Amino acid sequence: MGKLAVISDLHVDINHFSATDLQLIAELLDANQATHLHLAGDIANKETAAMTVIDFFQRQLPTTFHWGNHEMADLSESLIETYPDPAFLNFQTVALSEKTLLLGVNCWYDYGYSDLQSTEEILRLKHLFWYDRMIQRTGTDPEISHQINERLRQTLRGLPQDKEVIVTTHFVPKATFIVKQTGKYVRWNHLNAFLGSPEFGAVIDEADNVRQVVFGHTHRRFEDQVIGQTIYSCRPLGYYYEWQLTRRFVLENQLTENFQPTKLRGLLRTNQAAFNQYKAAHLRAELQQAITWINY
């Protein structure tokens, strides 16, 4: 028996993670008796920073990874899909045990979660607001996504049917995990176009031996959901100003009446020393909530 730990959306650069913070994660993995770590994308914005993190954890325990959209902005298309590292799992598997395989897939999005009908408007928003405007890829987003989903179908069909498969990906595979905003925030629903692909989830539905799917990207944490016969787990770490510990810090110190994560960075800088002290006391608990643990 072993225990898989999956972490998505570490964002070590945006979150200003130090060597001490990474060591805290390593200690948490050890305390929970993790025997394999998989990093499910958005480790860092830059390839070198991401690989430094991967190297750190590989010195602690077996560690694999695939990319999220943030690393992709620093990579050519060939390196996005086929990165020359044996720990890179994009349409590759690693045997966790005699009966359990871990399959990693970067994934992509096809606008299937958007409330907009106009592809032109979706692309306008992408180029105006979305980080992925910096990613250079061949083909349209729906074309790329469909190719990936078809490759997933063929990959799953080619795996031994007597093995249980744990799939890790970065993007959202099921509409259950898409939050629909209302009121003055309803316009944010337009950006759901870039969160994932419902077709990816439909391909998973075809496979009888996929035990669990783990993903992130949405920066929202959910309770595990069983859809069909598969467990879906989404608990990304996300940005520091989105964390639960940050929410508690702001509200406990009465720094604002309304918790709006995207407007907190200046407020936190003004109270940096106090926030750093609070974070040091509560980061371990935040990390514990943002790791998916799977016994195998």
Residues covered by each model-derived region:
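Beta-strand-turn-beta hairpins that frame and shape the catalytic cleft
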Residues: 1-5, 93-104, 109, 226-232
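N-terminal active-site segment of His-dependent metallophosphoesterases
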Residues: 1-58, 72-78, 131-138
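Active-site neighborhood of phospho(di)ester-bond hydrolases with catalytic His/Asp-centered motifs
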Residues: 6-8, 37-42, 63-69, 87-90, ...
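Active-site environment of divalent metal-dependent phosphoester hydrolases
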Residues: 12-15, 44-49, 69-77, 94-95, ...
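Conserved beta-sheet core of the metallophosphoesterase superfamily
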Residues: 55-66, 99, 177-260
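Glycine/small-residue-rich loop that forms an oxyanion/phosphate-binding "nest" at active or ligand-binding sites
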Residues: 75-92
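Active-site-proximal loop/helix segment associated with metal-binding centers of metalloenzymes
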Residues: 104-161, 171-191, 260, 269-273
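Metal-dependent phosphoesterase/phosphodiesterase active-site architecture
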Residues: 231-296
